């Protein structure tokens, strides 16, 4: 059986409901040469009796079997990562250029994003011993991948608008 015919497993603890089994064809710069073969939204593997959570799963295949390195995240965390991504992209597009090192060393907090009656702090990780170099590399990667990211952001914006957000 060729890999493109391989289906995401349904007999494991994560129970797929919605799948993208051809994700390997669109996995950014790794398209067609990735071990990430699919994505799914389904019932979380950690569900307790009477409590059902939705999770997103990244399915990786080693060539012989589905990898234990496949990642599963609760759906709200996927959205929180999208929020963190969007706020970070906005920061690097509109604010980071103002600072010689790409961030304000005295005030590394970028934003406080309101969620659930509290807020998620978005900040440059100044605990990282190589943060100046890593910010530079991060900015270069954002620049290099601008077209890939932009395509996904436009699609996300379009879908959110279509959904009434």
Language-model features, listed with the residues they occupy:
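A short, structured beta-strand/loop element
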Residues: 36-72, 93, 100-115
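Short, small-residue-biased leader/transition segments that mark boundaries at the very start
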Residues: 1-3
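Elongated alpha-helical scaffolds
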Residues: 76-87
């Amino acid at each position: 059986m060729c890999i493109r015919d391989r289906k995401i497993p349904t007999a494991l603890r994560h129970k797929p409901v919605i799948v993208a089994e051809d994700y390997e064809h669109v996995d950014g710069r790794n398209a067609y040469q990735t071990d990430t073969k699919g994505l799914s939204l389904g019932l979380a593997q950690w569900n307790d009796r009477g409590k059902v959570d939705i999770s997103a799963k990244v399915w990786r295949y080693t060539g012989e079997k589905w990898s234990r390195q496949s990642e599963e995240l609760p759906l709200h965390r996927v959205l929180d990562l999208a929020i963190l991504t969007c706020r970070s992209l906005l920061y690097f597009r509109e604010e980071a250029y103002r600072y010689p090192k790409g961030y304000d060393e005295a005030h590394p907090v970028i934003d406080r994003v309101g969620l659930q009656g509290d807020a998620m702090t978005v900040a440059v990780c100044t605990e990282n011993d190589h943060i100046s170099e890593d910010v530079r590399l991060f900015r270069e990667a954002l620049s290099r991948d601008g077209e890939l990211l932009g395509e996904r952001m436009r699609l996300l914006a379009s879908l959110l608008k279509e959904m009434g957000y």
